[in-house]
Regions:
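Short, surface-exposed patches at the edges or C-terminal ends of soluble domains, predominantly
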Residues: 390-638
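Extended ligand-binding groove/face enriched in aromatic
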Residues: 75, 86-214, 220, 332, ...
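Bacterial Sec-dependent N-terminal signal peptides
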Residues: 1-22
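Inter-helical turn/loop segments and adjacent helix faces that build the functional surface
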Residues: 68, 169-180, 239-251, 304-312
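CBM-like carbohydrate-recognition segments
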Residues: 13, 23-55, 67-74, 79, ...
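Oxyanion-binding "anion nests"
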Residues: 233-282, 286
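Alpha-helical scaffold segments in carbohydrate-active enzymes
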Residues: 31, 63, 83, 128, ...
Length: 638
């Protein structure tokens, strides 16, 4: 049943997606980079300010970079943030004393920039925003005030503005005490703002009951505003993505997400798949279908399903919503520019002039084309929906990355010793973050093994990836491959495992012990070095791909530098050569397969588009290698 649902959803999605060469996300991103070339700055008389709107857009741009490996998206993110962040990490136009939780959102982009570039200014700027949360005024319960000028008020919007950044910072830098606080923000918001009859949440809650918009008994605003609900849903999913799975409040957040999704599903417009601005009053005079909220609901639900936080039965809600967005809101003008119409520019509570939260107030706000919040939400939704057709390729399969034979450790900027070099969560040059995204785009779970491989440890792995086994230069106390380790891996391969060996050249890895393993499959890495590259003379690392290569069927050229030669004997065979130098080798053993090459060549530096010329198709090759490896996984029962 689940399989048939998935197939029908994918078929429907493929009908909806435009036949144009560029996907909707790419066309919308082109509009973004045309309208806002270096920030949300279009009028010289009104210089751009540090604002959450930009963070919404840049999260969408970030997702496109992850999916395409095209450096123009990363460069755009960096250019936008550099417009505000100086070399010392100060943020232009930002005032911590405002205690405006909206201002925290862009911290997520700062964390990405620091993780990728290691430039300290981004860490310093992100830490300024983290420090704001340390002293942010709170309700008596402990919830963050939305702004200093809105005392004792929690708005649904604020959960998206603050909590995903708070979670990412805490996860990255080991602030374990923060997770209970983060969970409580959602728990308190739901307890205070959720309508028990409909499951919907009111836009705002005033603990003091002093605001004119607040019900004197409950403190709640009068209406269910769609975008406020949508911000809240996006926040739940983005927080869960980085929230410790074993934390005592993880289940609490998941249950809140389920209640949220149930409520949203019930008020989806059955005709268009979209959602109205005042979400529960579709027939009210002047009410309209709204683009930003619809995009956010689609993104939140689709992402929650992809990450396993919601069952697949919710996916048709996202699919129907996305089809409606493409039909009702996305348009191309005479110049060929893609635009998003139908986003309400703003809706709030209180302030000056005073916003009373009435239905008439919500209907009075302007609905505009290419509003940053709507465009950013659409980009994020499109990133989720455009990956959907490939997610079923290897659903339920797992790739296990070795962190035992390659167990390098390094102190991070806080002085904490952490695993580094070819790790799933590393975004700097030497990490495998983008490669991990490639595998996950096909439904493969990415996990790590930090102990010796045993029958039990390997039992749930379909693919086992060992990269750049340590020598003493890498690790003073390396875990060398032992005969017992080699035997365990050999037996696992024979039973149907897919082993991937990405080695290195002389001086950069252990050869003596690692070959104990490789030799068992007829593959021997020689302690030498070829494909030398001097500076940016990339030609030295060029490897031409002949037509019809079984692993890389559509690439013409890849880049591998400083690799060792490989000697083969039965059962191993070459899959790719450069002259007489073996580049790719494979071996079949029992039900299993081994793939080997003498370079960790798919680390971020050579797939993220920022360094090597585009003629070297390493990012595309990562996708084709992943698909080839998935095909080698035996079908159960055969």
């Amino acid at each position: 049943m689940k399989k048939s649902i998935c197939l029908s959803i994918i078929a429907l999605l493929m009908q909806v997606i435009s036949v144009n060469a560029q996907q909707p996300s790419e066309r919308m991103a082109a509009t973004v980079m045309s309208i806002w070339k270096d920030s949300l700055y279009t009028d010289p008389s009104k210089p751009a300010k540090w604002t959450y709107d930009q963070g919404v857009i840049l999260k969408g741009i970030e997702g496109l970079w992850y999916r395409t490996g095209d450096a123009k998206y990363f460069n755009y993110m960096q250019k936008c943030m550099d417009f505000f962040v100086d070399d010392k990490g100060n943020i232009r136009t930002y005032k911590a004393s405002d205690y405006n939780i909206d201002n925290v959102l862009c911290g997520r982009i700062l964390l990405t920039l620091f993780n990728v570039t290691n430039k300290e200014k981004y860490f310093k700027a992100a830490t300024i925003l983290r420090d704001q949360l340390r002293t942010q005024p709170r309700t008596n319960q402990g919830g963050f005030w939305h702004k200093k000028i809105y005392p004792y008020q929690m708005w649904l919007d604020g959960l998206y503005m603050g909590e995903p950044f708070y979670t990412e910072y805490a996860t990255t830098y080991g602030d374990t005490a923060a997770f209970s606080d983060i969970a409580h923000q959602f728990i308190w918001m739901e307890n205070n703002a959720r309508d028990k009859k409909t499951g919907l949440l009111y836009h705002g809650w005033d603990e003091s009951r002093q605001q004119k918009w607040a019900d004197p008994k409950t403190g709640l605003s009068p209406h269910f505003w769609a975008r406020a609900m949508a911000w809240y849903g996006m926040a739940l999913v983005d927080v869960l993505e980085n929230f410790p799975a074993n934390h005592k409040y993880n289940d609490s957040i998941r249950l809140i997400l389920h209640r949220f999704a149930d409520a949203v599903k019930k008020v989806q417009d059955p005709k268009t798949g979209l959602w109205y601005d005042i979400i529960n009053l579709p027939a009210a005079k002047g009410n309209y279908l709204e683009a930003s909220a619809s995009s956010m609901f689609v993104c939140a639900i689709a992402k929650a399903v992809r990450l396993g936080f919601l069952p697949s039965s919710y996916l048709p809600v996202a699919q129907k919503g996305y089809a409606g967005i493409l039909k009702e809101f996305l348009e191309t003008d005479a110049s060929g520019q893609t635009n998003l119409k139908g986003t309400v520019s703003v809706s709030g509570l209180g302030g000056n002039p005073y916003r009373d939260g009435s239905y008439a107030y919500y209907m009075s706000e302007k609905v505009i084309v290419n509003d940053a919040k709507g465009v950013g939400a659409f980009l994020q939704a499109a990133n989720e929906m455009e990956v959907l057709p490939t997610l079923g390729l290897a659903k339920g399969k797992t790739i296990l990355l070795d962190d035992y034979f390659n167990a390098e450790r390094k102190k991070d900027i806080t002085g904490t010793l952490k695993p580094f070099h070819y790790k799933w969560n590393e975004w700097n040059n030497g990490g495998f973050a983008l490669l991990g995204n490639v595998f996950r785009s096909y439904g493969v779970a990415t996990k790590t093994l930090s102990t010796a491989p045993t029958k039990i440890n390997l039992a749930k792995a379909d693919i086992y990836l060992i990269v750049d086994a340590d020598n003493v230069a890498d690790n003073p106390t390396p875990n060398y491959v032992q005969p017992k380790d080699a035997e365990e891996i050999y037996n696992w391969v024979k039973a149907g495992g897919v082993l991937v060996l990405l080695h290195n050249d002389k001086g950069n890895a252990d050869f003596e012990h690692f070959n104990i393993l490789a030799d068992k499959f007829g593959i021997h890495f020689n302690e030498d070095s070829y494909n030398k590259v001097i500076g940016n003379e990339f030609e030295g690392g060029k490897v031409d791909i002949p037509s019809g290569n079984p692993v890389l069927p559509s690439e013409k050229k890849i880049y591998q530098k400083e690799i060792s030669s490989i000697t083969l004997k039965s059962p191993a065979k070459a899959l790719l050569k450069k002259d007489e130098l073996v580049i790719f080798a494979t071996a079949k053993l029992g039900k299993g397969t081994v793939f080997a090459t003498a370079d960790p060549w798919l680390y971020n530096e050579y797939v993220d588009g920022r360094k090597i010329p585009a003629e070297y198709e390493n990012f595309k090759a990562a996708h084709d290698l992943a698909k080839w490896l998935i095909k080698q996984i035996p079908i159960k029962g055969k």
